[in-house]
Amino acid sequence: MNIQEAKEEIKRTVEAYHKRDEDGSYKIPVEKQRPLFLMGPPGIGKTAIVEQVAEELGINLISYTITHHTRQSAIGLPFISKKIYGEKEYSVTEYTMSEIVASVYEQIERTGIEEGILFLDEINAVSETLSPTMLQFLQYKTFGMHRVPEGFIIVTAGNPSEFNKSVRDFDIATLDRLRKIDIEEDFQSFKSYAYQAGVHGAITSYLEIKKDRFYFVKQDIEGKRYVTARSWEDLSKLLQVYEELQYPLEKELCQEYLADPEVAEDFTLYYSLYQKYREIYHVPDILEGAEIKETRLFLEAPFDEKLSLLSLLTDALQIAFTDYVKKKELLSRIFRFLKSMKEKLSEVSVSQALEEEIKRQRKRMATLKEARMLSKKEESIRLQLIQMFGDFYSALKERNSTEDTGNREDRKENEADFSLIKDCFRVKEEERQQEVEKTGKMLSNALNFLGNTFGEGQELLLFLSELTKSPYALGFLSDVGNETYSRYNQYLLLKDKQKALQEEAKEVLRS
């Protein structure tokens, strides 16, 4: 299966293993909760999808590369203790708690969350001395004498032997205790992830043109040459910062990420063209609905150049769609806070409630960060949330410093303060609605430009197809809708249906 299908399977498994019966016990007993074994080439995103599942489900994640561990660190250090058997004292060997198991308990203490995923990478490359320990662990979730807490699901990963000389094939006894998921590289599933992760448009459009360069590992007389999904994503992060700093992209830099001279040089050349297209095609003007006179330039452009234009349009819209999703979540959280605060107006002052909430949010964010459970998106939302609560608090202080509140009853003063906060929230919501309207117009302008310039051809079809691969775009369209999008989408669907019927009719006539 591809990486997105594997992610969905992991998510379903975690939810199934965590399902409890009416007595509070897990419906699937711990010893029957088979660990998942993700088998696939390096750099395709096995670790990334496990991180995404943990984030989406709001559970802990502990990750280890098992080949970095010795037998002692895995099962604990031995020590001598005294035991009495049959009224006679004996010296017996016991073990300290495994470093891995201890880290799970520490994570639970940090976050207060008792469920999670324990992810062990390179499990099929463990040393022979660790093999018996791993067999015991896979069946009973124990390292030495200590068990992993019940709420933790075991997910493991490994690479095929052609990618790692240390890999050993599991025997039947081990395989019979695992659920093996074979994962293959797939560019289309990577694209869905790329939109969510904000991968640079130059990379996605380049790979759309040259899909064979998305992932490969080759061996020749000069050594190994390889490019992976991880290579492209990491290069994207650097590329975005380089653009902010106005640094050029050199072939040598690309080759540090793309370990193939030919691909590194080719992408460097494409990126310079991509930047040139950004200047030529005036994407902001298209999205603002300005009249574009040089339509002949677009019509006569080669297909790869048209793909770059579509990518530039998608990139610009993607920023707006992402901002929409974040702002929606941000204001939803503020609304829930205001709703709960309204119910407690008789118990606590508005300013005190805001102070306590700011402290709580900061503490929670620090906890999540320390536990490595804070994604970039979540961190951004929480920082904005703290900033907005701070703005509300400042507005209260400013109002109360200029007004005489000494003669007001506490209850009325609290209601007046709450009314001010509601007004502040209303302003933020109105600003958000204006941005939603602007985003909708940008999308309509992009679609109308493509429709007027290229007609209902493959360019428009490709653009609509790319929108459906972005979870943020789908979120916007699902919540807000867009008349222009619906019109073009329905027309193309009808066109496809008519084409299919025509083909069917031809087949009938032939027979």
Where are these regions (language model features)?
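AAA+ P-loop NTPase catalytic core and its hallmark functional loops
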Residues: 1-212, 217-220
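Conserved helicase/translocase motor-coupling segment
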Residues: 249-275, 281-284
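Long, charge-rich low-complexity segments
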Residues: 273-301
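Intrinsically disordered or highly flexible coil/loop and linker segments, enriched in small
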Residues: 23, 244-245, 276, 280
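Conserved AAA+ ATPase small/helical "lid" subdomain
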Residues: 32, 192-260
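Glycine- and charge-enriched loop/helix tracts that form the active or gating conduit
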Residues: 180-185, 227-230, 237, 293
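Non-catalytic, well-ordered alpha-helical scaffold segments
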Residues: 132, 229-233, 265, 307, ...
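Terminal-proximal interaction/regulatory segments of ATP-powered molecular machines
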Residues: 299-511
